[in-house]
Amino acid sequence: MKTELSLLDRSLNLQRYPKRAQELLQAWDAGDEYIIKYVEEELNLEDGKNILILNDNFGALSCWFSDKHNVTMMTDSFVSQRGTLKNLQRNQCNRVQLITSTEEMPQGFDLVLMQIPKNNRMLTWQLQQLRQSMDSSCPIIAVNKAKEIHSSTLELFEDYLGETKTSLAWKKHRLVFSNANVSNPKTIAEAVCWSVDNEDIDLLNYPNVYSGEKLDQGARFMLDHIPSDPELRHIIDLGCGNGVLSVKAGQLNPEARITCVDESFMAVESAHRNLEVNLGKERQFQFIANNCLDGFKKHSSYLVLCNPPFHQGQAITDHIAWQMFCDAKHILCKDGKLLVIGNRHLDYDGKLCRLFGEENVTTVASNSKFVILEAVKAEKSK
């Protein structure tokens, strides 16, 4: 896979995070290249400008513009943040301030660059924050694949931010130009709250939480199959989202210590709030933004709950699920269990059989769309 971004007589070595032996995906896209070309060729910025970059996938924009400017990068993704840091170090770039989506949006910028997020509610929230934080003279330039920029996308920019126009397409990407100048902007709440039908569970969801406006069908199915067992002293919810599975596990296992892990800072913050509200602040909880289970001790958990994502940013991929399964096996105690929910077509059973052994993988439940699989770590497993 190509790792050298060569553009305008400059080169950067950029790699995705975490680094894989046989990487199939690139650490930047044509959208990054389009923004770089436009800023360098059309804006003629003086050195030392203050630039805010939102949703930089693996730091291509941060690395490039930190050469001559003061860059702040804001993201909801732990993986993107860590990947950006690694690429900054790899290219010996100037210091970039890295902040998370749960922090207050800073002010005082001369230019804002944005990779448009996949989640429309996250986009709307970021546009609202930009309208409140940026001067009307500050150019805001966003990018996405042309096929993903609809008239409804541009309406969001105009309703929540200000006057908006678009570029011509280049390498199947398009730029969106806007300024924070709408006189009567629409507003949205920071969080969406709702209750789970037929459960004693109330959930708060920050903007970038997966399925934040209603319970996804996979999680709904999984709720009915979470075990209750006094031997489950430590339960990990891997890819926890808003923490709904953790809340149910905590209700069924009141003595268990529960750890919620997600690569989204907003998901982790949502889970933190939801476990404390539904289960009480006196319980033993831990909330970690992380790349899967990096850094967890071996043989440290009795049950891992897992509802894996099948995309990383805009890219469709199954390597995250595979890493989750491998990490879960590593940290499970002997006879510990991994409970996985997934779409039937994703072949998680094949992956789990390869990893845990066919005799240690069983189907707990299935319906027309989903399957719940249990993998047990046998005594001989390492």
UniProtKB/Swiss-Prot annotation:
EC class of the enzyme, as a word: transferase
- Give the CC-aspect GO terms: cytoplasm
Question: What intrachain disulfides are recorded?
Answer: none
Which InterPro entries does the record associate with it? rRNA_m2G-MeTrfase_RlmG, RsmC/RlmG, SAM-dependent_MTases_sf, Small_mtfrase_dom
What GO molecular function terms would the record report?
23S rRNA (guanine(1835)-N(2))-methyltransferase activity
Q: Which residues cross the membrane?
A: none
Under the heading CDD domains, the entry gives:
AdoMet_MTases (cd02440)
Q: Does the keyword Cytoplasm apply?
A: yes
Documented EC number(s): 2.1.1.174
Q: Which Pfam families match?
A: MTS
Q: Which UniProt keywords apply?
A: Cytoplasm, Methyltransferase, rRNA processing, S-adenosyl-L-methionine, Transferase
Signal peptide interval: none
Biological function: Specifically methylates the guanine in position 1835 (m2G1835) of 23S rRNA.
Q: What is this protein called?
A: Ribosomal RNA large subunit methyltransferase G
Could you tell me which species this protein originates from? Answer: Aliivibrio fischeri (strain ATCC 700601 / ES114) (Vibrio fischeri)
Name of encoding gene: rlmG
